[in-house]
A protein has these predicted regions:
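Catalytic binding pocket for nucleotide-activated donors in carbohydrate/polymer assembly enzymes
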Residues: 243-244, 277-350, 398
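Conserved phosphoryl-transfer catalytic core
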Residues: 392-442
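Active-site and donor-binding regions of nucleotide-sugar-utilizing enzymes
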Residues: 7-167
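Donor nucleotide-activated moiety binding/catalytic core segment of transferases
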Residues: 55-70, 231-280
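Conserved catalytic-core segment of nucleotide-activated headgroup transferases in glycan assembly
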Residues: 14-22, 27-28, 146-147, 157-242, ...
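A donor-sugar binding/catalytic signature common to diverse glycosyltransferases
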Residues: 73-102, 258-302
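Catalytic donor nucleotide-activated moiety binding site of glycosyltransferases and closely related
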Residues: 34-50, 215-255
Length: 467
């Protein structure tokens, strides 16, 4: 019997997102519930312990003990892996952002596609029977039901904890103007681009081609600009290079993603965004001025497909090139309240000051229907079902073909006759890798290969004839 007054939390390798803010709410306002943070790395565990909270590694004996007793597991995504000791726990999925982009089952290409399909096969029982999912408005409810295959009776309707937490949280020094030795009347802007599926490590040079000109504009308009890069884009070569050169520049700050940026939303005067859901979170948190820097809008495979019309469901001055981006800083005080109110209603209609309490109460009251059983999915090896392999190991088929080559009157190269059992899987791996990396070139999103392509590759590498 699981204890609904023991909760465990995780947000990947960081202490942030909706799980972090609900965790803090439990700590400060719900003394009847005992919260624990589970971690994948010692670094994250040690960081949270330094803040004074209980944290354990997933693989530790203590986590196994707590996890086997806990009643609620708070996450911000549809998890790929559930530890065995979590079987039967209520999964409270707070997600990680509203918005226009396709997610989960709506993703049809990119490196995540295969992983998404796999986890929905492996974890479908958990997703369907044990998971509660937070949505923030009727529009987002419809969106996530379709994208994430949700059951309506397992939906929680409220605002995000990271946007509607009742109070302030401070896990680091918020006085960034003092750190940069800038006067108090300095305005603060943030540039927060989203992850690009096709240009994760060569984006920054396209977005910011002239840092000197940017710094001059910031000086002239009395701005500090924060570069808040997506974690998957932080290794962008040009970004790292610019960071080294300008790290001591008083007008730019390269954000450390170890610090939760949401803690200083109330300090932001201007938010420059593109397709990231952080736009909606900043809007909900009271940011008054926005710009949309979308120089790559419409380019193929720049990011995932839109499930909703981007132009209709965002607001702020549109910048399609670097010059227009620079001009934003001199026009940052224009009134956008009417558009902000329109977007707020579309994306945050379920939110109010009681949102976090609604979430907690819904999780406490939820009882999974363990009698509901899903159909069993059977998977078969094609060699066993269609061909009838008689070898003990799969590689035995390749040894068999190799023996036939040695007996053949055809003059196969000596290397092939001695190493076909290795060449055959090498060729398959090579073709599969090519198909994964050539989606744009082939103009075909399929990544599964055919039998003949493997032998075409062997033929090409070893100069074989069709015979």
């Amino acid at each position: 019997m699981r204890d609904k007054k023991i909760w465990i939390f995780n947000a990947g390798n960081a202490f942030d997102g909706n799980p972090k803010w609900l965790f803090m709410y439990i700590v400060n306002y719900r003394k009847d519930i005992t919260p624990y943070w589970f971690c994948y790395t010692e670094e994250t565990r040690n960081y949270i312990r330094k803040l004074g909270y209980q944290a354990f590694l997933f693989k530790s004996k203590m986590a196994e003990k707590i996890g086997s007793q806990a009643g609620v597991y708070v996450v911000n995504q549809k998890k790929e892996v559930f530890q065995d000791y979590l079987k039967g726990i209520t999964v409270l999925n707070l997600w990680h952002g509203v918005g226009c982009k396709t997610v989960e089952k709506g993703v049809t290409y990119g490196f995540l596609n295969e992983r998404i399909i796999k986890k929905h096969i492996i974890n479908m029982d958990c997703y369907q029977n044990y998971q509660l999912f937070l949505v923030t408005s009727p529009l987002m409810e419809k969106h996530f039901i379709k994208q994430c295959d949700l059951a309506e009776d397992k939906i929680i309707r409220a605002g995000y904890p990271c946007c509607f937490y009742p109070g302030k949280i401070k896990t680091y020094d918020h006085d960034i103007l003092k750190q940069k030795k800038l006067p108090e009347d300095t305005k603060i802007a943030v540039y927060a681009p989203t992850y690009r599926d096709a240009s994760a490590t060569n984006f920054f040079s396209q977005a910011i081609p002239d840092m000197e000109k940017l710094v001059d504009v910031l000086e002239k308009n009395n701005f500090l600009l924060i570069f808040k890069m997506h974690p998957l884009m932080a290794n962008d070569f040009q970004y790292q290079n610019i960071k080294k050169i300008y790290t001591n520049c008083p007008r730019v700050l390269f954000w450390d993603n170890a610090n939760d940026f949401y803690e200083i939303f109330d300090r932001i005067d201007l938010a420059i965004v593109d397709y990231s859901s952080i736009f909606y979170d900043m809007l909900a948190s009271g940011v008054k001025h926005f710009a949309r820097y979308i120089f790559d809008y419409g380019q193929e495979n720049t990011l995932r497909d839109f499930a909703l019309d981007y132009m209709e469901n965002t607001c702020g001055k549109i910048c399609t090139n670097f010059q227009e981006f620079l001009e934003v800083f001199s026009k940052a005080d224009e009134d956008e309240s009417e558009e902000i109110a329109r977007i707020y209603k579309k994306f945050w209609e379920y939110a109010d000051e009681h949102s976090l309490e609604k979430i907690v109460d819904a999780a406490l009251l939820f009882e999974p229907d363990e009698s509901k059983k899903l159909p069993t999915l059977y998977s078969f090896d094609i060699f066993d079902t269609l061909i009838g392999r008689s070898t003990l190991l799969p590689i035995g088929v390749f040894y068999h073909v190799q023996d036939k080559m040695r007996e053949s009157k055809l003059e196969y190269p000596k290397y092939i006759k001695e190493n076909f059992y290795k060449i055959r899987p090498w060729a398959e791996s090579n073709v599969r890798e090519y198909y994964r990396k050539s989606i744009v070139l082939r103009k075909d999103r399929r990544t599964e290969i055919t039998f003949d392509l493997i032998y075409e590759r062997i033929k090409e590498l070893y100069s074989l004839t069709d015979e």
